[in-house]
Amino acid sequence: MREPAFWHRPPSLLSRLLLPFGAVYGEVTAARMQKVGIETGVPVLCVGNYHLGGAGKTPTTLALVQLLRDLGEHPVVLSRGYGGRLRGPILVDAKRHSAADVGDEPLMMARTAPVVVARERTDGAALARSQGASVIVMDDGFQNPALVKDASLIVIDSRRGVGNGCVFPAGPLRAPLPLQVARTDVMIIVGDGQAADAVAAQIAARGGPVLRARLAPDETSLERLKGRRVLAFAGIGDPARFFATLRASGVEIAEQRAFPDHHPFTADELASLADSARRGGLTLVTTEKDLARIGPDAASLGSDLVALAVTLVVEEEARLRRFLLERINQARTKQFAR
């Protein structure tokens, strides 16, 4: 879905008219969040966000996986598999499954990490354990109470923050902000904007680490784009951030097209992109997540298609590493005491 523009402006007449619906939605979500979850037997780290749409959870999840591997752990990612038809639990095979099977984000992550998809997170956790998981990393699921979380890491975009601060449909929030803040252990702010500073101050006041991070484009991909004019397209939570990343890296965008998050590209849309690129002498560039969704149909876009990979770089990585060690050790001590 495309996010309404009023979600990211000061409260308007429309958002005020929708506040009663937001109050009901918020009450239901808040009651659900306060249910007691099930212990999995291994530490569970959740990467989530406060609002609907993208914030950088997937690159954060992959960065967390790498940090855990550096600490000697065997992390397995657990995802609901949004956009996929398979309910799971299933271990994603990047060579066998498609985005239509398991969702675009799990398919993309499965190229570098073991990923389990399951609508029922308890079943997914059991499969992850059977795959030798020493730590489960939940990609999304902050508002889901199914599993006991040993740490919740919230990702927030520095330019968008929490929008107008209202609960869906009056705003982008999935649940009332105070409840979500109270359950946050770490906040990771992506980018150098200031829109998230107010909520970050609340986390810091509670003693939680607030870490700055940035998305670093893959140098090999950028080298392929050097000196070229491009047609950039993306169907992700925040296409504008992708376009801004390209421009900040010195890429000349001659044309850009934004699609809704998880957008299933049609043959006509792909043909239109290829035709526009050919007529303008442009190189097509998109995200890894979009490429996972396009799948074999990418051949219709030509050999010049570039999928820009990005990596999350955390400024105070040592601080995050210490936090992870502490929470993992606490979780294991708690499990041993039982």
From Swiss-Prot:
SUPFAM superfamilies: P-loop containing nucleoside triphosphate hydrolases
Entry GO terms, CC: plasma membrane
EC number: 2.7.1.130
Pathway: Glycolipid biosynthesis; lipid IV(A) biosynthesis; lipid IV(A) from (3R)-3-hydroxytetradecanoyl-[acyl-carrier-protein] and UDP-N-acetyl-alpha-D-glucosamine: step 6/6
Keywords attached to this entry: ATP-binding, Kinase, Lipid A biosynthesis, Lipid biosynthesis, Lipid metabolism, Nucleotide-binding, Transferase
Source superkingdom: Bacteria
Binding site residues for ATP: H51, L52, G53, G54, A55, G56, K57, T58
EC category name: transferase
One matching Pfam family: LpxK
InterPro entries in UniProt: LpxK (IPR003758), P-loop_NTPase (IPR027417)
GO BP annotation list: lipid A biosynthetic process; lipopolysaccharide core region biosynthetic process
One Gene Ontology term of the molecular function aspect: ATP binding
Keyword Nucleotide-binding among record annotations: yes
Substrates-to-products reaction catalysed: a lipid A disaccharide + ATP = a lipid IVA + ADP + H(+)
Keyword Transport: no
Function: Transfers the gamma-phosphate of ATP to the 4'-position of a tetraacyldisaccharide 1-phosphate intermediate (termed DS-1-P) to form tetraacyldisaccharide 1,4'-bis-phosphate (lipid IVA).
PANTHER family: TETRAACYLDISACCHARIDE 4'-KINASE, TETRAACYLDISACCHARIDE 4'-KINASE, MITOCHONDRIAL-RELATED
Family per record: Belongs to the LpxK family.
NCBIfam families noted in UniProt: lpxK
Protein name: Tetraacyldisaccharide 4'-kinase
Species: Rhodopseudomonas palustris (strain BisB5)
